[in-house]
Regions:
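N-terminal Rossmann-like dinucleotide-binding module
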Residues: 1-33
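Short, charged, surface-exposed secondary-structure boundary motifs
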Residues: 37-40, 60-61, 101-108
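Donor/substrate-binding cores of folate-linked one-carbon enzymes
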Residues: 69-192
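Acyl-group handling in specialized metabolite and lipid biosynthesis
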Residues: 194-203
């Protein structure tokens, strides 16, 4: 099975390694910047890297010919409808919440802010609306008392994401089927960016 990986930074680079170890061919990597960590890892592995002209949009031309699936791993770029049409199964991404809860860029922060006792992660189909595509796989974990968003991400949700992405790809490779369970809109919530406090020190 051949995929195109769209992503960035630590999560994208680690997902790349996990997918390659599974024996799945990464035909192309798409990144927002040439010096991105994912770009460096892909180039070291001999994989072609495409740097987006517009870091907010993935055009069809960025997707490798013959890709069966597009995988988004920490990508803030929207994968266009035309790009999704280039892959047999379209695209999937990982979101660190139990979708449809906490749709948005700050899902882990809102999980902690709202005092959720349970968190989770979802592999979902990329779609026109952000984080609203059908669910391919989910798992959950408890949130520890006093745990920060960063701690929760590093302890549980990032490792969960790598595992779920690999499990979904492994199953698609074996069965030719990508599960698609529609999200229940009755339970949808938003997780927009949380502004830093006005008196927060500069970094």
């Amino acid at each position: 099975m051949k995929i195109t990986l769209v992503g960035s930074r630590y999560f994208g680079a680690t997902a790349f390694d996990a997918i390659c170890k599974e024996g799945i061919a990464v035909a192309r990597v798409v990144v927002p910047a040439a010096d991105d960590r994912l770009a460096q890892v892909a180039q070291a592995g001999g994989v072609k890297v495409v740097v987006l002209d517009d870091p907010n949009n993935v055009p069809a031309s960025a997707i490798a010919e013959g890709s069966e699936i597009i995988v988004a791993a920490h990508s803030h770029a929207r994968v266009s409808t035309e790009a999704l049409a280039r892959a047999r199964f379209g695209g999937i991404g990982y979101h660190p919440s139990l979708l449809p809860r906490h749709r948005g860029i700050a899902a882990v922060e809102w999980t902690v802010r709202e005092g959720d006792p349970i968190a989770g992660g979802t592999v979902y189909h990329l779609a026109e609306r952000m984080d609203a595509g059908a669910i391919a796989a989910q798992d959950w974990c408890f949130v520890r008392k006093g745990e920060s968003a960063r701690d929760l991400w590093e302890r549980a949700l990032a490792p969960m994401g790598f595992r779920l992405l690999v499990e979904v790809l492994r199953d698609v490779k074996a069965t030719g089927i990508l599960p698609a369970k529609p999200q229940d809109e009755a339970f949808a919530t938003r997780a927009p960016m949380i502004p830093a406090p006005a008196n927060a020190p500069a970094r």
